[in-house]
A protein has these predicted regions:
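Conserved class I S-adenosyl-L-methionine
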Residues: 32-41
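Conserved Class I S-adenosyl-L-methionine
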Residues: 160-226
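Class I SAM-dependent methyltransferase SAM/SAH-binding core
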Residues: 42-91
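Class I SAM-dependent methyltransferase Rossmann-like catalytic core
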Residues: 2-15
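A short glycine-rich, Lys/Arg-flanked "PGG" loop and its adjoining helix->strand segment in the class I
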Residues: 115-130
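Conserved alpha-helix/loop element of class I SAM-dependent methyltransferases that forms part
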Residues: 13-31
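A short acidic, Gly/Pro-enriched loop at the edge of an enzyme's catalytic core
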Residues: 91-103
Length: 226
């Protein structure tokens, strides 16, 4: 059984699209921008970014199943002229220098080498382009001081309501997992379900650590670089 579908995890993640919209509206008005989404997954944000921007969105992800799901969405929406998805990592891409107006990531950079991420994003962004990062506030604050070293300047931020990831994601997911186990008994045991239980336990144990924000930083040529 597809655990994601059984738990309707996509609906829970979709609750955070409102923050994607609010953050996007803080950007300056760009006419049909070219956007790169890093770690696009099955594409909820990808589709939303295409709708918000009216431009072209390229999603990249290292998970082939997520790429396949997004490609199916693109085909169903007949949106292949504006949305593309590629199975590749940020560090193995073949994109030209200075080719994106906006780079967007949600919950990816904290899993990677931040320095390498910033170097590659600077290469890919056009001059004065924007990098938008949705991460925990703890990660963002600890990383903010390093932004000038890579030629980036923090321009704006959108802070999510306190404990949003518990209220809108962890708590309802915990209830859905319990209901699923109650219904299916021993047959409910699966690696994916256990992974979700670990995520829920992590958020529940310290909701403050999961509080998130979205930083909008700009490539500034000659600004603060070492």
């Amino acid at each position: 059984m597809n655990i994601d579908k059984a738990l309707n995890v996509e609906e829970l993640r979709g609750r955070f699209l409102k923050h994607t919209r609010l953050a996007y509206r803080r950007l300056p008005l760009l006419e049909q921008p070219r956007i790169l989404e890093i770690g696009c997954g099955p594409g909820q944000q990808t589709i939303e970014l295409a709708r918000l921007s009216g431009g072209e969105v390229v999603g990249i992800d290292t998970d082939p199943s997520a790429v396949s799901r997004l490609q199916k969405r693109i085909d169903q929406a007949n949106a292949g002229d504006r949305i593309k998805v590629i199975h590749v990592s940020l560090f193995d891409n073949k994109f030209d220098d200075d080719c994106f107006d906006i780079i967007w990531e949600e919950g990816v950079f904290h899993l990677l080498d931040a320095s390498k991420c910033f170097v590659e994003c600077r290469r890919l962004l056009k001059p004065n382009g924007y990098l938008v990062m949705h991460e925990t506030i703890l990660w963002l604050e600890s990383t903010k001081i390093r932004l000038p070293d890579f030629g980036f300047k923090l321009m704006d931020e959108h802070i999510l309501p306190k404990h949003s990831w518990w209220t809108d994601y962890g708590a309802p997911l915990k209830d859905r997992i319990k209901a699923y186990r109650d219904e299916h008994g021993n047959a409910s045991n699966s690696k994916k379900l256990s992974q979700y239980e670990s995520v829920v336990a992590s958020i529940e144990s310290d909701p403050d650590r999961s509080d998130c924000g979205i930083y909008l930083v700009r490539r500034m040529d000659g600004y603060g670089q070492k």
